[in-house]
Amino acid sequence: MSKLKGPDGRIPDRLPDGRPAVAWERRWTEGTLPLWLVATAGGIAVIFVLGIFFYGSYQGVGAGG
């Protein structure tokens, strides 16, 4: 982690010479929970919920009674 912190405690986006403060490789892997993991879990949850809706829409189709 960089020791350069702003008045609110956040790390600045850029260093004084213009370079990024955090390397692009680490932007997706730092933090409490990696963003790619949250996005993957969210995507799976959306597919699951849509699957339940599609399953429910076809239940009873073709049933004679």
Swiss-Prot record:
Signal peptide: none annotated. InterPro entries: PSII_PsbJ (IPR002682), PSII_PsbJ_sf (IPR037267). GO terms for cellular component: photosystem II reaction center; plasma membrane-derived thylakoid membrane. GO terms for biological process: photosynthesis. The keyword Transmembrane helix applies. It is a single-pass membrane protein. The chain crosses the membrane at residues 35-55. Keywords: Membrane, Photosynthesis, Photosystem II, Reaction center, Thylakoid, Transmembrane, Transmembrane helix. It is found in: Cellular thylakoid membrane. It comes from the Bacteria. PSII is composed of 1 copy each of membrane proteins PsbA, PsbB, PsbC, PsbD, PsbE, PsbF, PsbH, PsbI, PsbJ, PsbK, PsbL, PsbM, PsbT, PsbX, PsbY, Psb30/Ycf12, peripheral proteins PsbO, CyanoQ (PsbQ), PsbU, PsbV and a large number of cofactors. It forms dimeric complexes. One of the components of the core complex of photosystem II (PSII). PSII is a light-driven water:plastoquinone oxidoreductase that uses light energy to abstract electrons from H(2)O, generating O(2) and a proton gradient subsequently used for ATP formation. It consists of a core antenna complex that captures photons, and an electron transfer chain that converts photonic excitation into a charge separation. Belongs to the PsbJ family. This is Photosystem II reaction center protein J. The gene is psbJ.
